[in-house]
Amino acid sequence: PASDSGFLRDP
């Protein structure tokens, strides 16, 4: 998800 670490990995 996008809300994981602060960067877009898999929105």
Swiss-Prot record:
TM spans (from-to): none
UniProt keyword annotation of Secreted present: yes
UniProt entry tagged with the keyword Zinc: no
Keywords of this entry: Neuropeptide, Secreted
Primary location: secreted
GO biological process, one term: neuropeptide signaling pathway
Compartments it resides in: Secreted
Record's GO cellular component terms: extracellular region
Family note: Belongs to the FARP (FMRF amide related peptide) family.
Protein role: FMRFamides and FMRFamide-like peptides are neuropeptides.
Protein name as it appears in the record: Extended FMRFamide-10
The organism of origin for this protein: Tyrannophasma gladiator (Gladiator)
